[in-house]
Each structure stands twice: as structure tokens, then as C-alpha cells.
Amino acid sequence: MRVISWNVQGRMKALPEQLKALMQRQPDLVALQEVQGRTVAQWRAGLQQHGLAFSAESITCAQAHGRTYGLLIASRWPITQLPWMDVPYQERVLSVQVAAPRGSFELHNAHVPNSDKYGWIKVETFEGIYQQLACISAVPRILCGDFNSPHSERPDGSLVTLGQEVRADGRAVVWDTWADKAGRSDTGMRWDRAERSVLTGLAAYDLVDAYRACNGYAVQGCSWWWMGQGKTVGRRFDHIFAARALNVATCDYLPVFHANGLSDHAPIEACFEPAVEGRIGHCRCSGAGIRQ
């Protein structure tokens, strides 16, 4: 089972090439971020033509609140949309239950807002995701998307969050307080805790970092690049977290998508080999945004 998560940057002219590149990977499930209203129908139709006949979207929800971008999930197997999470912008997390041949599982597609524009809304989004998913689930789960975090990771496995600053001697310390553009102020401790709660804390609830499970910390993959002051700095902002029962076999980034100018993000791709067929579970569902 092949899952690809990708921030497509709301592109319109590049969409045919984005779709072509994605379909060459032959995914079973696709989770897209930054899909806009003018492209969602084209995305759904194109994915359906390649066998991903079941889809759900949050663009309609975004537009209802005067916002532009949302999420799209497309699947080879039937899906049922789950209730919205309690986050500041509901369209930023789209959740479905997938009726796959080897058993049902949940897929949660997230796009955590960046801090430059949205400030503490980013932290509240992390907190909302953790509150929803920090529980023992009756079915396996996958959480994927663009999290705009962390700042960096170190070879020893330690994480540097955006709630920390790196001193000249290399030490990462939590900063004191910060006010965003809206004038909202809070502590670095809260920020640091919120990022860690999802990026590492959900492993306690069977949502394990698939990339690190497959590659360890000797490999430093990147999915987004900052360029300025004569240098380029890569960040691993896009992630897939998954239940152990789904048995991740490989997980890698696809930097050629970025190199070819298709988006400012590289997709992350994971292949799973679930060993045992399971019973399709029961879930509460809203049915909104579902299409077959």
C-alpha cells in the first residue's frame, strides 16, 4: 500500500504535470495540502481517472469561512469522512476512514499553519491535533501532511523545535515569550511542548514517525528549502506517522518533484505491508465532502 502526502502550493498551471508525476508513482492513497477551489474538481477528476475513485475535500469548508486553501484525500478504496477536529481552522485537518482490503484504518491529513503569518494559531492547531489523537484507537491510523515543523533534528535523535533558539555554542534553549502579528503573546515553553506533543508524543499512541522508523537519524531528508543570504537550508516539514500494525516498509522524500519546479515542497511517500486482514471497523462519520 503506497501513500503519498504533498503540499501542491495551490498551483494551477502546473497541475497537469503534478498529476502526471504523482500517478507515475502508482499510489493507493494521496493526501494533498494547499488545494484551492479553482483546482479541486480537476484534481478529483484526474485522480479518479487513475483509479483513485474515492475522495474527500475540505476546500468547501475553507470557502465557507472566507479562506482559499484546503485539503484533498483520494483513495483506491471506499472512504468515509470522520468528524472535523477541534482546531482553529477546521479545513486544516481532514480525516477519513479507509475500507482497505486488509482492513479498515484512519487517515488524517493535516496542514499546520506557518508561524510567520498565523502566529499562535499554529500552536493551537498542534494542540488540537494532539488532543484528538492522543488516545488508544480500535483501528490503525495514519497522520500525514505539512506540519511546518520542526526547526531541525540532530543525529542523536533530539529535536529542535521552533519554540527554541540555537545558541552560538550549539545549545538549543526554549525562548522566553513571543508576540505574533495579531498581538497575541505566550511562552516558548508552550510552543515547544505543542510541537513535541505531535512530532514525538503521538508515538506513545501508536503514531510512529515512518521516515525515522525506516531511516534512523543518520539520514537527513528535506521536504522544503529556505533560500536567503546566499545559502539554502533544508527543513523536514512534511511527515507521515503510522500505526505499527500497518508495517511501514519504506518511507522517503521525492525531491525531484521540487527540483522540477512542481511545488515548493517535495512529497513524502511511504509503502506499507499490512500482514493480517482485519475486520472493517465502525466509526462515527459526517458523510460531508465524500464522493464516489
Predicted feature locations:
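Conserved beta strand-loop-helix elements of the APE1-like EEP
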Residues: 66-81, 201-205, 228-248, 272-273
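Extended recognition/assembly regions associated with phosphoester-bond processing machinery
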Residues: 111, 119, 134, 140, ...
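Surface-exposed cleft-lining segments at the edges of enzyme active sites
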Residues: 111-124, 181-187
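Metal-dependent phosphoesterases centered on the DNase I-like endonuclease/exonuclease/phosphatase
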Residues: 127-233, 237, 286-289
